[in-house]
Amino acid sequence: MFSHTHTGVTDFERAFAFYSVVLKELGLVLRFREDDEVANIHWAGWQTPGVGRPLFLIGKPFDKAAHLAGNGQMVAFLATSRAQVRRVYETALTKGGTCEGAPGLRPHYHANYYGAYFRDTEGNKVCVACHD
C-alpha cells in the first residue's frame, strides 16, 4: 500500500534514539542513516528485514523550517500480537514517549482491534495495533 512514510523531527539524535529502540520491538531494522552537516540533512529509515518496502522514515524537514507535530496526523504500526503492542507501548514510554491511550481493546473500531497510542519525543502521535 505505502512506499514510505516520513515523520518530521527537530531533535534528530533524540528521535533517532527513541525510534531505534521502539522499532526494534516491532522487528524493524535500520536500512540507512544519513547525516550531512554541510547540507543540514539528517534522516534515517527502517524496514522489515528482507523487504525493500515500505519504509518508515524520520528526518528534519527538507525545507529547513522547524518541525511542527500535526494535529490529527498519526502513524500506525501493525503488531503481530497483543503482547507486542504492550511491549512497544512500554518501550516508548520508558524512552521518553507520552501516553495517548493505554493498550487495550477498542471495540468501536472492530471486535478484535487491540491498540495503544503514544506521542514520540517530538510530539508526533503514534499507534501500535493488532487485529487478532
Question: Residue ranges of each PLM-predicted region?
Answer:
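Conserved beta-strand in the GNAT
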Residues: P54-K60, Y117, V126-C130
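Vicinal oxygen chelate
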Residues: T10-R14, V75-A116, T121
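N-terminal beta-strand motif that seeds the catalytic metal site of vicinal oxygen chelate
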Residues: M1-F16, V75, H131-D132
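Long, continuous compositionally biased terminal/linker segments
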Residues: V38-Q84
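Short, solvent-exposed loop/turn elements at beta->coil junctions and helix N-caps
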Residues: D35-D36, D63, P103-H108
